[in-house]
């Protein structure tokens, strides 16, 4: 039976009024919850993909409000979202709810478990596709958390004794990537080349992690260097119209000219068509794999400081704002962040000066953190830099920040502190975060809609919000929660 529901049709029904109350958390009676759930299940079977996703969002919200996760369990099983169903089976299904079907589903999903990770249907298909194409040029388009880092590691192992390069778009991502692959590369490659001066043309094999500028210098240094494989992380950046994207295109052209059989692995969180990665003057063909699963469903909030309209919820399906605290006036951005923050928060700003200024403003309204580890960290940083360094003031209040001016050694140190210490709740960062740097967070506050000299593009915005509530945080067996299937994104202007 055809289900031709569209959002335009649904907007003009009584359902929209009930949904508005539900989505901003107003208390409903049992009959209203049952009505919402029945309609949501109907939506998940619609032909329109937007209606399907809206139905899924309603089911997730229903389950988080009522703590009845059986509807989400059944939908997750049917849609191949096995990390969701497995987490529910382990944490929310009581013994008296178990039956033949739950036991059969449990046994069925075992095939999608690898170590401590349960893969979704498309995640499993992605890995199988990648493993069959080690020697081919391919593109992988998958959201954050779909295991692109694991694909990089497996490729490095596959190219043992050969020449392989991982291209990263920023020095921050370069450092993070090097740290991740260093352990598995021992015994496979003599070293990890991260700077042109480290490269030795006499080495038979080579594992390099470089930005496009550094790779270009290495290629100029050794005209005979020919790579067997180049992994291009954050490959969508090649489509941007700027000097760095042109350098990236240049090194790809040179690499293929030197070795026509070089295998390129283009990894990106979004891509409309893999053919868009075909560069002029190259001859490679691209096979693409694109993930279309919808597991996380973001909740967007707008706090309008200029017009004093308080907090509003933005519904991306109905394209409208719903007031939550219309008479509230918190006055300044730091007060909004303080009131609506969670245990771990990412705050986005565009300029280094704005980042440091806001970090100090936020520090001024927060209490000092009582932690020996934080005190020791402040002492260590004071020895490395001048004691008046703003970062130390912020660190004492549970805040870190990083941008291009923060030394690499300090940045790595404070990132590890943020990941491992509950006392540090806030990280304030720039577009570095868009380049694949991964930090745990439950909520995001976007205080600037610009990236560099232009506005955040649609794709950059999606990439940014995708950094919140990664799968390893949602489905962690000890600390995970399905509340994180609904990451909260606050836009404060």
Residue map of PLM features:
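N-terminal helicase ATP-binding lobe
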Residues: 1-493
């Amino acid at each position: 039976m055809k289900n031709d529901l569209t959002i335009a049709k649904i907007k003009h029904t009584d359902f929209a009024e009930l949904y508005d109350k539900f989505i901003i958390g107003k208390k409903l009676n049992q009959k209203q919850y049952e009505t919402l759930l029945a309609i949501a299940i109907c939506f998940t079977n619609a032909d329109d993909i937007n209606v399907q996703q809206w139905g899924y969002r309603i089911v997730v919200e229903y389950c988080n409000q009522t703590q009845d996760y059986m509807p989400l369990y059944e939908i997750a099983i049917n849609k191949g979202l096995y990390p969701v169903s497995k987490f529910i089976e382990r944490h929310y299904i009581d013994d008296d709810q178990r039956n033949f079907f739950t036991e059969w589903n449990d046994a069925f999903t075992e095939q999608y478990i690898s170590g401590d990770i349960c893969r979704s249907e498309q995640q499993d298909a992605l890995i199988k596709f990648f493993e069959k194409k080690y020697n081919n040029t391919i593109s992988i388009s998958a959201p954050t958390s779909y295991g692109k880092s694991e694909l990089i590691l497996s490729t490095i192992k596959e190219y043992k004794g050969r020449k392989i390069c991982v291209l990263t778009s920023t020095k921050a991502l370069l450092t993070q990537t090097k740290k991740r692959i260093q352990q598995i590369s021992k015994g496979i490659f003599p070293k990890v080349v991260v700077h042109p001066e480290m490269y030795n043309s006499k080495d038979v094999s080579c594992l390099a992690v470089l930005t496009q500028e550094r790779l270009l210098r290495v290629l100029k240094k050794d005209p005979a260097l020919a790579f067997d494989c180049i992994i291009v992380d954050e490959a969508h950046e090649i489509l941007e119209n700027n000097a760095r994207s042109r350098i990236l295109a240049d090194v790809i052209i040179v690499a293929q000219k030197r070795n026509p059989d070089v295998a390129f692995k283009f990894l990106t969180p979004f891509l409309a068509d893999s053919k868009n990665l075909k560069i002029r003057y190259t001859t490679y063909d691209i096979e693409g794999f694109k993930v279309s699963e919808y597991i996380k469903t973001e909740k967007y909030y707008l706090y309008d400081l200029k017009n004093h309209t308080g907090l509003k919820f933005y519904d991306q399906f109905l394209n409208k704002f719903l007031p939550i605290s219309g008479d509230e006036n918190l006055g300044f951005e730091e007060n909004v962040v303080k009131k609506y923050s969670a245990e771990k928060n990412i705050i986005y700003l565009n300029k280094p000066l704005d980042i440091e200024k806001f970090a100090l403003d936020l520090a001024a309204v927060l209490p000092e953190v009582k932690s020996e580890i934080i005190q020791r960290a402040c002492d260590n940083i004071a020895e490395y830099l001048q004691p008046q360094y703003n970062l130390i003031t912020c660190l004492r209040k549970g805040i870190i920040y990083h941008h291009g001016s923060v030394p690499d050694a300090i940045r790595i140190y404070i990132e590890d502190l943020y990941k491992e210490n509950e006392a540090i709740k806030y990280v304030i960062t720039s577009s570095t975060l868009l380049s694949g740097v991964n930090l745990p967070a439950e909520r995001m506050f976007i205080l600037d809609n610009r990236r560099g000299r232009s506005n955040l593009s649609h794709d950059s915005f999606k990439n940014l919000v995708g950094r919140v509530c990664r799968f390893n945080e949602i489905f962690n067996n000890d600390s995970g929660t399905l509340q994180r299937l609904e990451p909260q994104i606050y836009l404060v202007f």
